[in-house]
């Protein structure tokens, strides 16, 4: 049975057909609409899936935000244009006339990455550092989603009580500092207004401010990982996302984590499926895996 998997992120929408063998084919992308209207997202999703839906028997959605009863609740509205209560499952069922499930994108990615691990691992945490910072937790070999879908939203834990205000309404969240949006927001002078990708480019060219911004992000993530180790005693942490997978970033995180006491050290791995983890995880869950 073929699954039409959809990944809804803060900057892009992706869709692909995934067979029972887990192979991805006919992958497509569109920019996430900047408009805050449900109509804009519906139209973009329609354009994305219409060439693919005839080849699928079901739909699986991995989306940023909290997924509750098939609808999108944006913990940080800035990451998805302020959409609230957008009926993801209902919308895709109407567009495709196919049975549909939906799950948070980082939770979906965590499940895919867990399947790729070697050895006897039952405790794993996945972190995505991209437009925002999200996560997924596997404990006892099972994916944790929580009764309200909030499990794994580790980007909204405290990093700095005097830090910037996060889009979720809290002050000093990890996401407000370590994410691509957080890196860009802290840029000043010649880098003011630059996005995270541009800042990474400048850092590679030796720009001191750009390097400091990236180190600040990596240091914040390392402290989060130490907190996660203390909370879950996980056997490994897998890091993905456009920032998390940027050249040299994970090595920086490892350097800062090594400065923490040994009890908080944990193996760090780069995401095996890279940017396709959300798509694959959603498809796996649609194949009958229990949440």
From Swiss-Prot:
GO biological process: N-acetylneuraminate catabolic process
Keyword Metal-binding in annotation: yes
Reactions catalysed: an N-acyl-D-mannosamine + ATP = an N-acyl-D-mannosamine 6-phosphate + ADP + H(+)
HAMAP family: ManNAc_kinase (MF_01234)
Binding site residues for ATP: 5-12, 132-139
Keyword DNA damage: no
Name of protein: N-acetylmannosamine kinase
Entry keyword set: ATP-binding, Carbohydrate metabolism, Kinase, Metal-binding, Nucleotide-binding, Transferase, Zinc
Name of the gene: nanK
